[in-house]
Swiss-Prot record:
This is Putative iron-sulfur cluster insertion protein ErpA. Pfam families: Fe-S_biosyn. Iron-sulfur cluster binds at C44, C108, C110. Binds 1 iron-sulfur cluster per subunit. It comes from Thiobacillus denitrificans (strain ATCC 25259 / T1). The lineage of its organism: Bacteria, Pseudomonadati, Pseudomonadota, Betaproteobacteria, Nitrosomonadales. Required for insertion of 4Fe-4S clusters. Coiled coil: none annotated. Keywords: Iron, Iron-sulfur, Metal-binding. The gene is erpA.
Amino acid sequence: MNATTEMESPLVFTDSAASKVKSLIDEEGNPDLKLRVFVSGGGCSGFQYGFTFDEAQNADDTVMVKNGVTLLVDSMSFQYLVGAEIDYSEGLEGAQFVIKNPNATTTCGCGSSFSA
């Protein structure tokens, strides 16, 4: 199933994150790039988040479009990300993409690892 959503999505893709992704895609000079967010086993808490650019959209991907930027999440990762917010933050600790996930029962200090 391939779902494309602009509003009322079970995921929140913030303006800040979309803006940063757009600038990174512009730097690469490849308008076909999409941001893929995924969950994999590992990290200090059992699961970890990953971000990568991808040109391919798979049949089972959940697709969100925000401000002209496409976000892809595979079906396995999606179940761990329902209700999550994907944001981009700049602060004293540096600039980074951040996932605020209500499904995470514990998170690691690194911010990229969690357990569900």
